[in-house]
């Protein structure tokens, strides 16, 4: 389990994250919602160690990790799919997937499961990442994050700019991974219907703080749609 307690983060004189607390449980999808600019991506970057926190704690499996480097956090089992995918355009699909195995012993094979989850990657194994469509690149980015077998998978707006058929495939994979029961999933998402379909529980952020939280099945009753409407 990933546990965040009362973290604060500043950028210059701006207070970006304000006493944010949350838990991401194994076997569950925790969805983070909120309008643009409320601190969602900064929160994820803080969890990965890409930006420092001023106060509070981040723990994984009971061990505090907020002083660890991004590399050390990845080795502990945090997989991150950033907004914009950030695949290596000049590398082949196979080479991109092997980048996800950088923390594993040399010669570790690419898990066959990745091609079961995303069959299109098997067909395009020797194509350059830059030649793939946006949806295919997103599938590659998720597969790369899964290659090392993370205990926590963090996704930042995986449906952004993706065609509906691939959004459906990505949702199916996320649900399957959660139901398998060996991974916690933390999902930042702007597409409300996609988030509602997947959420076991949720938080809504506003101005860097947690405005609301609850069970995914209660999102409509709790009025979450109106809280995140643009």
Task: Indicate residue ranges for each PLM-predicted region.
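ABC ATPase signature
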Residues: 91, 132, 145-146
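Conserved ABC ATPase signature
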Residues: 128-132, 136
């Amino acid at each position: 389990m990933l546990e965040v307690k009362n973290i604060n983060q500043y950028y210059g004189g701006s207070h970006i994250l304000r006493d944010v607390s949350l838990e991401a449980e194994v076997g569950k999808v925790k969805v983070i919602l909120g309008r643009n600019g409320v601190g969602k991506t900064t929160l994820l970057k803080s969890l990965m160690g890409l930006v420092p926190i001023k106060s509070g704690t981040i723990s994984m499996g009971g061990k505090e990790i907020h002083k660890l480097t991004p590399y050390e956090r990845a080795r502990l089992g945090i997989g991150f799919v950033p907004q914009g995918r950030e695949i290596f355009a000049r590398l082949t699909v196979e080479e991109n997937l092997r980048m996800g195995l950088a923390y594993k012993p040399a010669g570790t094979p690419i898990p066959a499961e990745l091609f079961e989850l995303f069959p299109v990657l098997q067909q395009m194994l020797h194509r350059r990442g830059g030649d793939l469509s946006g949806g295919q690149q997103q599938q590659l980015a998720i597969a790369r994050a899964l290659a090392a077998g993370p205990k926590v998978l963090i996704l930042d707006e995986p449906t952004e700019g993706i065609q509906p058929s691939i959004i459906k495939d990505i949702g199916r994979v996320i649900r399957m991974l959660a139901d398998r029961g060996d991974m916690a999933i933390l999902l930042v998402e702007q597409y409300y219907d996609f988030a509602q379909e997947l959420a076991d529980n949720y938080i809504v952020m506003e101005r860097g703080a947690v405005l609301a939280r609850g069970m995914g099945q209660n999102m409509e009753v709790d009025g979450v749609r109106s809280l995140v409407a643009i």
